[in-house]
């Protein structure tokens, strides 16, 4: 992780790498976009990690693990240590980040990645309707920020693999579509490619005008009879997943967690750290 921090610092010293990447997309005829992880809790067990913002460190009272429903998961659930969107301060924090992105960068697409990590509220399911209302208002405010730039920026949240799971987490995609506050949605799992995304069910809720994208990830779900581990995707599997998603009515695919593009074995640790 020290290597990661040093690499990030070296990258930042070379200029505004986000602006450079977006400009190159535009130059190459690719619609430039930004994906913002809405509650990323990598390094949750290490409170001094550089992954954690000052806002997160300074406001432990806004963390999800202050709820009883998350306390029993201490040490097991990184997402359970995330920020609680029931607090207006948390929502305002993320809105400020989105405002900076929209006003400072030339982007055509903003993805709100609600799957990394998929925890936003207390696990008190009787409050599900209230959670959905809070998140719908939040997404509406995001839409207003994007529109205030004077140009259209597609808003595409990334949500769970089924409408029921999405709503349980606070994401009422049917209301979002009906109110016209999103341009599309991406459906997927937390870290793996799903064999059975409910694309038809999402389509029935959002209608024909909202684009639906299916998430393709670097690994696939484990299946019955297969060892308890993720299955690495290969080109044939990815083509099969994509064909199935398109047949089910998806408008496109969304690739996630593809760290490299090599058709051979990853480098060894010795090769990696020696820079070979």
What positions do the PLM features span?
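Active-site-adjacent "subsite" loops/lids of carbohydrate-active enzymes
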Residues: 4-23, 27-28, 32-104, 224, ...
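Anion (oxyanion) recognition and catalysis
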Residues: 19-22, 26, 147, 206-207, ...
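Glycine-rich, histidine-containing beta strand-loop boundary motifs that form or position
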Residues: 34-38, 114, 216, 257
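Short catalytic/ligand-binding loop motif for oxyanion handling, primarily in non-cytosolic enzymes
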Residues: 40-46, 118-120, 164, 222, ...
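Short low-complexity, flexible loop/linker segments enriched in glycine and/or proline
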Residues: 47-57, 124-127, 171, 199-203, ...
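Active-site neighborhood of glycoside hydrolase catalytic domains
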Residues: 89-212, 237, 242, 250
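Substrate-binding cleft of secreted/luminal carbohydrate-active enzymes
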Residues: 184-194, 230-276
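C-terminal EAL-domain catalytic cores of bacterial cyclic di-GMP phosphodiesterases
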Residues: 210-220, 225-226
């Amino acid at each position: 992780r020290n290597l990661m921090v040093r690499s990030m610092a070296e990258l930042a010293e070379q200029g505004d790498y986000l602006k450079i990447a977006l400009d190159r997309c535009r130059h190459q005829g690719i619609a430039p976009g930004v994906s913002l992880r809405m509650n990323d809790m990598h390094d949750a067990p290490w409170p001094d990690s550089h992954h954690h913002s000052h806002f997160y460190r300074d406001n432990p009272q806004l963390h999800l693990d202050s709820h009883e429903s998350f306390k029993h998961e201490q040490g097991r659930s990184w997402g359970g240590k995330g920020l609680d969107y029931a607090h207006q301060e948390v929502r305002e924090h993320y809105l400020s980040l989105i405002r900076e992105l929209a006003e400072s960068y030339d982007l055509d697409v903003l993805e709100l990645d609600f799957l990394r990590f998929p925890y936003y509220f207390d696990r008190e399911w009787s409050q599900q309707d209230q959670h959905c209302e809070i998140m719908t208002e939040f997404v509406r405010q995001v839409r207003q920020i994007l529109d205030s730039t004077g140009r259209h920026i597609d808003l595409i949240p990334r949500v769970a693999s089924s409408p029921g799971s999405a709503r349980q987490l606070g994401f009422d995609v049917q209301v979002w579509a009906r109110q016209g506050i999103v341009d599309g949605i991406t459906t997927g799992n937390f870290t793996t490619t799903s064999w059975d995304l409910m694309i038809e069910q999402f389509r029935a809720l959002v209608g024909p005008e909202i684009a639906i994208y299916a998430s393709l990830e670097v690994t696939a779900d484990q299946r019955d009879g297969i060892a308890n581990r993720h299955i690495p995707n290969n080109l044939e599997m990815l083509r099969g997943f994509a064909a199935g998603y398109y047949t089910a009515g998806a408008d496109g695919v969304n690739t996630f967690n593809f760290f490299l593009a090599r058709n051979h074995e990853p480098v060894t640790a010795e090769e990696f750290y020696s820079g070979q």
